[in-house]
Amino acid sequence: MALNLNPVSTPFQCRRLPSFSPRQTPSRRSPKFFMASTLSSSSPKEAESLKKPFSPPREVHVQVTHSMPQEKIEIFKSLEGWAEENLLVHLKPVEKCWQPQDYLPDPASEDFRDQVKEIQERAKEIPDDLYVVLVGDMITEEALPTYQTMLNTLDGAKDETGASPTSWAVWTRAWTAEENRHGDLLNKYLYLSGRVDMRSIEKTIQYLIGSGMDPRTENNPYLGFVYTSFQERATFVSHGNSARLAKEHGDLKMAQICGIIASDEKRHETAYTKIVEKLFEIDPDATVLAFADMMKKKISMPAHLMYDGRDDNLFDHFSAVAQRLGVYTAKDYADILEFLVGRWEVEKLTGLSSEGQKAQDYVCSLPPRIRRLEERARERAKQAPSMPFSWIFDRQVKL
């Protein structure tokens, strides 16, 4: 999925504007469950991690659940036929989908080792900071079980049985199946590159899936589909920018991989934004209130609870590198918001309640206010320190 913006490199802790990263808080870990391992630790921090329970590296927000009234749930049930005709068309048949092996050396071929050597030669030209971003993107994609779980919390649109034939359930399962290829492909390619510490990466993935995510969507599909619309757009932007940078550094295969993943994300973005477009059509007041609510909460990115067993602020550090490289920035955040405001024609809404009008004004005025902070973000980034990343064998990268 996508990245977040980092308070180290972006000064978004303004009272009047939302920040774009989770609130920095002390770690809160349950005393009940503790990790055990027979492996020796290579650092005091890792030794300490062995005693930590299965809980996020930072506090999550107070959980609000099932905030949507029954009459709104009925709206989603009534949209079952609409979803079948308008949502499922954005899925591709499995036989027409690309698969990771299409872009990887064939291990059964006689020149497999030569192909791997070619990948590793190209990998030498990729700088460490781009590897940090590529690995962070891959880890985000690999936490797919969390995202399917999140979608299946949405009242009126969840998969009630695990194999429900409803259009909403079919979409969620098939979307998950398409997304599953992304992490598989990035993981295998980065493994073959020889430039990254796969054990550290695999630990980070396990920690992240175990921690879950905290999107604050309240089991409410109005909130949930605003969130996924933003996220798919952000992921499209992020992978697209990674493709551009990989190409600039001479790895055309990595550029191709990031590009095809971005193409999938764009198709998924189209589907999710179409859902919210329909909600604006049939229930504009509740939908604009949901849009404003998610923006006031600040869109927390899917991997915001990322942890490698050592760095409690790993996601912030990863995000700072992405911001500095131009992979995902404060400007992108504002651009995505402005895109969605235009896509859903929020400025043209009429007949809203007084609260709906306030929400409309809020989301429409927010993008230019965010953009005014971009220059300050760039200035602060110039003074950022360097940090070691376990994913690249503790090599130092400027934040």
Curated annotation (Swiss-Prot):
Keyword Lipid biosynthesis: yes
GO MF annotation: an example: metal ion binding
Polar residues composition bias: residue spans: 1-12
UniProt-listed Pfam families: FA_desaturase_2
Binding residue positions for Fe cation 2: E179, E232, E265, H268
Region of interest (Disordered), ranges: 1-57
Name under which the protein is recorded: Stearoyl-[acyl-carrier-protein] 9-desaturase, chloroplastic
